[in-house]
Amino acid sequence: MKDGFLKAAAFSPALRVADCTYNAQQVLEQLQAAVQRGVKLAVFPEFCLTGYTCGDLFLQRTLQQGALDALEWLLAQTRTLDTVTLVGLPLLVHGKLYNCAAVLCRGQLLGIVPKTYLPNYGEFYEKRQFTPGSTEVQTVTVCGQQVPFGTSLLFRCRQMPSFVLGVELCEDLWSALPPSTFHALAGATVIANLSASDETVGKAEYRRALVANQSARLLCGYLYASAGHGESTTDMVFAGHDLIAEDGSILAETAPFAGDHAETELDCQRMEAERARNTSFEHSAEGYVTVEFDLAPEETVLTRRIDPAPFVPGDPQRRAARCELILKMQADGLAKRLEHAHAKTAVIGISGGLDSCLALLVAVRAMKQLHRPAADVLAVTMPCFGTTKRTRSNAEILCGELGVSFQEIRIANTVRSHFADIGQDETVLDVTFENGQARVRTLELMDLANRTGGLVVGTGDLSELALGWATYNGDHMSMYGVNAGVPKTLVRYLVQYEAEAAATPALHDVLLDILATPVSPELLPAKDGEIAQITEDLVGPYELHDFYLYYVLRCGFGPAKIYRLAKTAFAGRAEYTDAVLYKWLRNFYWRFFAQQFKRSCLPDGPKVGSVTLSPRGDWRMPSDACATLWLAELEQLKPGE
């Protein structure tokens, strides 16, 4: 439960139709095993105490009483179990029979939620036996306990306030306006659905989409426990298709007819953070009754996969589609700006590195979109003290293969003249030595753009902006920054995608060699003709920083939780010890706060993903904010703990 993680499970126990005692025993057996694994929320199917396929037997008082007896037995057996359990049963209230979910915790019946929408079409005839539930909450006596009864019920954990449970049953989700929508607006971060969804061709895919989409719309965790083996097969079969989703992603799922259960951890803190960011998500709890309960606080062992590359889709097909979309977005943004400014050229400083390579590829696409020749892109290479033969050669080959205009400006003499003006010793390889070169390059590009009636296209990426790895008013400045919304880990895949689609073998080969070149600003003199200044040796691995960036900006998590997630995500990577993860996380926070002043005057550039740092859009932060609180939280952690 630490850091907002809740271990939850959806079950489909094998049962016997109308054998309540046996069914309750099956529930308890699975529940006891789940508690040993740390499960704090266990959801069982609709009518799991009786079986869904009892038909008119539901109208028999013997079956109704048998279900109550089974519930009472479960309450007694779960007094010492530290978990919230949901089971389905028929319940007679004031002479009407309801299809209900009972919510149990430590021997207490927290509440009973009746089903709202009763299907009465096709193979379903629930209105024959049952009455729809009402939103009005009333108090009823069940198993000797005074219990709230109604659809407008929420259940909140005192020890983890971000865990607020709402309940609906099967058809409720399939309706036009599911009760879970109102539950979420009233504050529910987790929805449990007790279901008895029979299996037909194509239904599993539709069911999966329903659950995923509802969790996305409601910014919640969603558990769907469906009836399985043991239900009557007189006219239907039930596959036990259990699903657990969070904010649009399926985290755990059982294969139909597998006879298994779905189990994972839900991140309730993340749901709270998403809702805090989304001001369209309006809170409305009118008419709701919230029942509070207690669970013993325990650290949840994470078994869910934490993606070490949250910006990059793991599936090759999805990744390719994502790359094509991003390239089109970048190109369209630049095309609009070129069109609006009546720019004759797009001027780009080319280094032979990844970022300038991507910017050049985007500029060529933009010209193609505008039905203009690639020659309207002016690529400029500006070798100086740190330029190597490899990067210089790659820059020239790339420009030739793309058909852009190419110009070389040797800036060493200009830089030396500038150093003489300001009294900088050329042998002192300090920050002035590095930044002076970067600013001269920007000066050349800006004036060249003026001379050719063009715009300077910025090449810096999102990761560099987060770390402030740019020279203020040097490569930090441009007239339009096409890469400003693209993290470094994704830049690689965009260039690789273009390499795979390259029109010529030479273009393919040069793009692959650029991908294989170490990331470097090449501002310090080369050693034996090789790059001497490796960016990731200085600021840390970009895959770590992109991971940290995602969880800081997208989720608003604190350092302790991000450190924990990183240890899970990069487990098994020998180079990423706890000490290394900690070191670069601390470095990230220090740089992120210290370098905001560069982002406060960022050139225009297109947003391409959910995380961006534009001061006019998604990230508004004062340039002089203090990192004290975040660094203090980190100080309380020790690598290895």
Where are these regions (language model features)?
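Enzyme catalytic cores with a strong preference for nitrogen-chemistry domains
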Residues: 1-347, 365-374, 401, 406
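ATP/NTP-dependent adenylation/nucleotidyl-transfer catalytic domains that generate, transfer
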Residues: 23, 161-163, 219-220, 232, ...
